[in-house]
Amino acid sequence: MEQKKITQGDLVSMFLRSNLQQASFNFERIHGLGFCYDMIPAIKRLYPLKADQVAALKRHLVFFNTTPAVCGPVIAVTAAMEEARANGAAIDDGAINGIKVGLMGPLAGVGDPLVWGTLRPITAALGASLALSGNILGPLLFFFIFNAVRLAMKWYGLQLGFRKGVNIVSDMGGNLLQKLTEGASILGLFVMGVLVTKWTTINVPLVVSQTPGADGATVTMTVQNILDQLCPGLLALGLTLLMVRLLNKKVNPVWLIFALFGLGIIGNALGFLS
């Protein structure tokens, strides 16, 4: 009996389809229909009979939910199991869906902080810093870097998952993902901390004293001068930490934005901010 094999072309097709995984998002099965759509090239390759194709499609219409950028290993391992099943291996529906469930949780645990908590804020911050100066490269930089990394994660995850098959489950159970997540979180916090002083500008021009200088000119000491001597960027850091604390207490971000607008306008009108 000729062995049925998923080709590299099938993997490319599944990779391209995976970018539409959320197009059919719903609150019953989340990405379930999208995952089924991703599997169609493999199913057509492995099951020539229409009845077998229908059964395989139904098998993948169940609930599925993980970070889209890291869904590659799940698609690949599932395809590898379908390939083994099509070639006579004793693999039932429960085993295939069990592997999907076993992978999507750990991958979401690392994918969310990596993609949404680290990659997107860092690339958006870099793009915004250019956009604030009127540079059109700002949004383009964000778009291309974010998507290049996102697509690379998905593609190499797909290749790795298909190459290793179900053995990848043991890797997901180790400390590798936890260490990767912690490292990415530290990097993201470091970059955002550096950008705090660049983005947040607070100036308190209240005059504390005026003294004659050596050249006869008047030397004015303001509250901002004193704060800068103690710790440059102290107010920016304090405001950022306050906002983080309020967000952690579930304060509505929109209200915080309006509050900052109001504080800035009132402070400038009364002369204690500029």
Swiss-Prot record:
Q: Please give the PROSITE patterns that the UniProt record associates with this protein.
A: PTS_EIID
Q: What Gene Ontology biological process does one annotation of this record name?
A: phosphoenolpyruvate-dependent sugar phosphotransferase system
- Keywords of this entry: Cell inner membrane, Cell membrane, Membrane, Phosphotransferase system, Sugar transport, Transmembrane, Transmembrane helix, Transport
Cellular component annotations (GO), alphabetically ordered: plasma membrane
Entry membrane topology = Multi-pass membrane protein
What residues does the PTS EIID domain cover?
4-273
Q: What is expression of this protein induced or repressed by?
A: By L-sorbose.
Query: Which residues are listed as membrane-spanning?
Result: 61-81, 99-119, 126-146, 186-206, 226-246, 253-273
The subcellular localization recorded is: Cell inner membrane
Q: Does the keyword Metal-binding apply?
A: no
> Has keyword Transmembrane helix?
yes
Notes concerning its domains = The EIID domain, with its homologous EIIC domain, forms the PTS system translocation channel and contains part of its specific substrate-binding site.
Question: What does this chain do?
Answer: The phosphoenolpyruvate-dependent sugar phosphotransferase system (PTS), a major carbohydrate active transport system, catalyzes the phosphorylation of incoming sugar substrates concomitant with their translocation across the cell membrane. The enzyme II SorABFM PTS system is involved in sorbose transport.
Q: What is this protein called?
A: PTS system sorbose-specific EIID component
Could you tell me the gene encoding this protein?
sorM
